[in-house]
Design a protein with these regions (language model features):
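Hydrophobic h-region of N-terminal signal peptides that target proteins for export
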Residues: 9-18
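Sec-dependent signal peptide recognition
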Residues: 2-10
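Non-catalytic, glycine-rich low-complexity segments
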Residues: 20-47, 100-108, 115, 359-375
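Surface-exposed loop and adjacent secondary-structure segments within mature catalytic domains
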Residues: 116, 122-168, 189-229, 233-238, ...
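Extended acidic/polar, glycine-enriched regions
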Residues: 42, 46-117, 121-124
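Single conserved hydrophobic/aromatic residue that forms the stacking wall/gate
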Residues: 462-473
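Surface beta-strand/loop "capping" patches
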Residues: 35-37, 347, 358-407
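Loop/turn elements at helix/coil->beta-strand transitions in domains of secreted/extracellular proteins
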Residues: 104-105, 139-141, 189-194, 249-253, ...
């Protein structure tokens, strides 16, 4: 009897039982797949087994074979936006993903101002949070995936997370900037939007890059760039633990809000920003993925009059000129002198969305991009500044770049000019909206050679922006 039992057991073990396909967390029910694309599917199955993937939007079955270790990958063509659909995978036993939508997918990343949830941080609320949470159920086509905080010495290929549908119960803990960005896309395009957020408060840009990418960045202080000692500042740790687990997921583009933790090496931030964008596009396998980022918002830091913040902001704008398919959302009017996490996250998310809508979806009539300094010429005791994208409508309309100053006239504020001595003095500015120019002058500077705008950590400006953008020089 004992021998008979052993023979039967051996025969049972010899039978190849069907195994269920295993997927990474980012491929799951409730997800949004990028429309009109060949999206990546990958995972594990029985070694050398045939893996079949069938999507209900067209009923077609796509096949591939797992390698000797059980790993497999294939491309799944999507069509126009729509859903909900099912995706069925099998190497013998079916695995069904349901409530799948097809639409637009964006990756949202950065440090705490991107991480800040709709419900806010303790004693640091998000303006309009209650309304945003209450009406979240009106946007069932918004789906959210939050990569957990993981700092890893080695590359990871998965994470512990799941897609969620926008509801009052789920939205409160999701990135506020990310959610408001996605909500505006959803409202403007009328199609599903998938948002993947990967954020860590206090993180440096180097933590989101590979060591090789940092080493290949020319002209920087490599020792400082690699001097991080914390989980969120050591080079490559967050790239390994929070980017690689989702980097194969097909997406449209990126939004980014980071830089506060790089004030110590502001002089290298432009080059590092350019290198990060190049790296991420290579990692996703698409060198033209749009990359939109947020100007750091005003905050006192070491003091109102000090300048660690505007030096980083200047680096952000200089990077813009070297990053194709990019844009920046200005926040000069959205800061807070005593809270590093300002409350007006809706405006930040929407300004980023306006950039995407204008540049990637062909939506016209939006206030994007922000005015950007183009050139300067001298006219006697005045400096005449030329901008791209200055508003061209009436000075006192809702799209005005200016407000009434103390003298009762509409004037831009925050400008300073200097002569050869480089001592800056407050300047009077006149808005020449009809030809995209601003004239600045000061009674204390007869021969001006330099101009700057809002060049301090925090400045209460007398002018207002359009509701959606601010100018930078």
């Amino acid at each position: 009897m004992k021998r008979l039992f052993s023979v039967v057991l051996a025969l049972l073990l010899a039978v190849q039982l069907p195994a269920r396909v295993k997927l990474p967390a980012v491929l799951g029910s409730n997800m949004v797949l990028q429309r009109n694309a060949e999206v990546n599917f990958w995972g594990e199955a029985s070694p050398r087994s045939r893996v079949r993937v069938t999507a209900s939007w067209d009923g077609r079955t796509h096949e591939t074979r797992a390698d000797a270790s059980g790993r497999w990958a294939l491309k799944l063509p999507t069509g126009e936006a729509g859903g909900p659909y099912t995706v069925t995978l099998s190497d013998g036993e079916p695995l069904v993903l349901d409530n799948v939508l097809v639409g637009e997918v964006w990756v949202c990343s950065g440090q705490s101002n991107m991480e800040m949830p709709v419900s806010g941080f303790m004693f640091q609320p998000v303006e309009g949070a209650v309304d945003a949470i209450a009406d979240a159920g009106m946007y069932p086509g918004i789906r959210m995936f939050t990569v957990p905080r993981v700092s890893s010495k080695t590359p990871l290929d998965d994470c512990d997370a799941a897609w969620q549908t926008a509801t009052p119960a789920s939205v409160g803990q999701f990135s506020a900037v990310g959610y408001f960005f996605g909500r505006m896309l959803y409202k403007a395009l009328g199609i599903p939007v998938g948002l993947i957020t990967s954020n860590w408060g206090g993180s440096t840009i180097e933590a989101w890059m590979t060591v090789e990418a940092i080493d290949a960045t020319p002209g920087i202080d490599h020792a400082v760039a690699k001097s991080g000692t914390y989980d969120n500042s050591i080079p490559q740790r967050l790239y390994n633990g929070m980017i690689l687990p989702v980097c194969r997921y097909t997406a449209k583009g990126f939004i980014w809000y980071q830089g506060e933790s790089n004030r110590k090496n502001w002089y290298d931030y432009k080059a590092l920003q350019v290198s990060l964008v190049k790296l991420w596009r290579e990692t996703w396998g698409d060198g033209k993925m749009p990359f939109y980022y947020t100007q750091l918002a005003p905050y006192r830091y070491e003091g109102d009059e000090l300048r660690s913040l505007p030096l980083v902001i200047e680096a952000q704008y200089r990077a813009l000129a070297e990053i194709p398919h990019s844009g920046i959302a200005a926040t000069t009017d959205l800061g807070n002198p005593t809270c590093i996490h300002p409350a007006r996250k809706r405006e930040v998310g929407e300004r980023l969305a306006f950039l995407a809508l204008a540049n990637d979806y062909g939506v016209t009539g939006l206030p994007a991009p922000a005015p950007v300094y183009k050139s300067m010429e001298r006219d006697g005791n005045k400096l005449v500044l030329t901008f791209d994208n200055l508003p061209v409508r009436a000075q006192n309309g809702v799209d005005s770049f200016v407000a009434f100053g103390p003298d009762g006239y509409l004037r831009p504020g925050g400008f300073e000019i200097a002569g050869e001595d480089r001592v800056f003095h407050p300047a009077v500015a006149n808005f020449k909206y009809w030809d995209n120019r601003i004239e600045v002058s000061s009674d204390r500077v007869s021969d001006p050679v330099a101009v700057r705008y809002a060049f301090r950590n925090y400045l209460s400006l007398i002018h207002i922006s359009e509701p959606t953008r601010q100018a930078e020089i």
